[in-house]
């Protein structure tokens, strides 16, 4: 049972976890052992609440396929168990991220100090550019 929140959990039977051979450096070990984890989670066939399903299916996330299946591949570690834990943690984090309401930004105005800093910076740049001109003597 994978716990998402206090009221929401995913039964282990809804997850399709397979061990596959990892890619990359590691020599003979990586070529002979199946330490990478390929996790598939079908959103539509899951027991998640409808609100969660709608939010996940509406999201345009690169890990969600067009037919509503979340596919996660974990191969960071040399251990199959650590990769399994990493894949499950990524699944939980993704579901939490996509189903939480984003707080609306409250519009603010620039502070007086920030306006003064901006104007001082503009004045300094202006004087630097003014000094780049030709030097004129006062006797003309």
Swiss-Prot record:
Residue ranges, compositional bias (Basic residues): 131-140
Swiss-Prot/TrEMBL GO biological process terms: regulation of translation; rescue of stalled ribosome
Keywords, ordered alphabetically: Cytoplasm, Hydrolase, Translation regulation
Superkingdom per UniProt: Bacteria
GO molecular function: peptidyl-tRNA hydrolase activity; ribosome binding; translation release factor activity
Location of region: Disordered: 100-140
InterPro entries on file: Pep_chain_release_fac_I, Pep_chain_release_fac_I_sf
Self-association state and partner proteins as the record states: Associated with 70S ribosomes and polysomes.
Family listed: Belongs to the prokaryotic/mitochondrial release factor family.
Stated name of the protein: Peptidyl-tRNA hydrolase ArfB
Gene: arfB
């Amino acid at each position: 049972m994978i716990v998402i929140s206090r009221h929401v959990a995913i039964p282990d039977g809804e997850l399709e976890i397979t061990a596959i051979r990892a890619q990359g450096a590691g020599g003979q070990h990586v070529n002979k052992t199946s330490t990478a984890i390929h996790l598939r989670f079908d959103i539509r066939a899951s027991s998640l609440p409808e609100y969660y399903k709608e939010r996940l299916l509406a999201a345009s996330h690169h890990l969600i396929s067009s037919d509503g299946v979340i596919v996660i591949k974990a191969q960071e570690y040399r251990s199959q168990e650590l990769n399994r834990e990493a894949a499950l943690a990524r699944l939980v984090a993704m579901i939490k991220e996509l189903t939480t309401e984003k707080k609306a930004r409250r519009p603010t105005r620039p502070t007086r100090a920030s306006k003064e800093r901006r104007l001082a910076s503009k004045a300094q740049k202006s004087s630097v550019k003014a000094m780049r001109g030709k030097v004129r003597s006062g006797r003309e």
